[in-house]
Amino acid sequence: MKYTQTTLDKLEAVVEEAGYVLRYERGSFQSGYCILEERKVVVLNKFLQTEGRINTMLDLIPQLEINTDLLSDESKRKYKEVLLKFETEEK
């Protein structure tokens, strides 16, 4: 996966199309993000650069409850790619 703004935009689209609000804010996040499940809000550390934001999204997306029926075809492909990468790293 390339560490470009386009890749980040696609990852953000997956989260947003799944009904989550994605915000970049200051905070003392040990992992670079915070998930507020009840409100479907994801807060990422705004000081991360593009590569850090992408890596954080790759860690974050598999933890979210995502209904793939809500995703566009492009977002479904990106979501499956992220899950495959996550499963590969877990082994």
Regions found by a protein language model. Give the residues of each.
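Auxiliary, metal-adjacent structural segments of Zn-dependent hydrolase domains
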Residues: 1-30, 91
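Short, solvent-exposed coil/turn linker segments
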Residues: 2-3, 45, 67
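Extended aliphatic helical segments
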Residues: 14-15, 21, 41-43, 82
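Active-site scaffold of zinc-dependent metalloenzymes
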Residues: 26-51
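Post-HEXXH active-site segment of zinc metalloproteases
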Residues: 31, 51, 64-91
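Short, low-complexity, polar/charged sequence segments that are solvent-exposed and flexible
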Residues: 41-44, 61-65
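Short alpha-helix carrying the canonical HExxH Zn2+-binding catalytic motif
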Residues: 53-62
